[in-house]
Amino acid sequence: MRVLGIDPGYAIVGWGVVDYAGNRFAPVDFGAVCTDAGVPFERRLDEVYTGVKEVIERTKPEVLAIEKLFYQHNQTTVIGVAEARGVILLAAAQAGLPIYEYTPMQVKLAVTGYGKAVKKQVQEMTRILLKLPAIPKPDDTADALAMAITFCHTNGNQLNRFTVRSVGPI
């Protein structure tokens, strides 16, 4: 199965495409769509949409795994990311891709086995699982690859699409 993972944003959209078969990962391609801060916001959204659409057309994924939006303290940032996420979801929907959303905790758990792992641990485990010589840069790209790995590890267990289980005392 070919999976496109995306770490949404409006300045940088990390993306990573992974093939997964027989419990083995093979990185296909990865990178980032970057927009210029000096450009009007609607133009940046167009660049995000066009960039993601091009990645989908070129790499032909079967599914999209994307980070679920969570509340941030800076409302301006969260609104901008939500709008960028909207054009990303539009590109995926137009391509007929099923869309799966994951929280940061689900990604940490799926990639490292620990839901409270730090970013560096997730990135290093992503590098190891994909047999890459170095952690991909920018960080958004590594995060997108981790998103694709999360789909692969949770595919088949539909409950993981909807819930985050916490481990701890009851």
Predicted features, each with a name:
Residues 1-170:
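Phosphate- and other anionic-substrate recognition elements at nucleic-acid/protein interfaces
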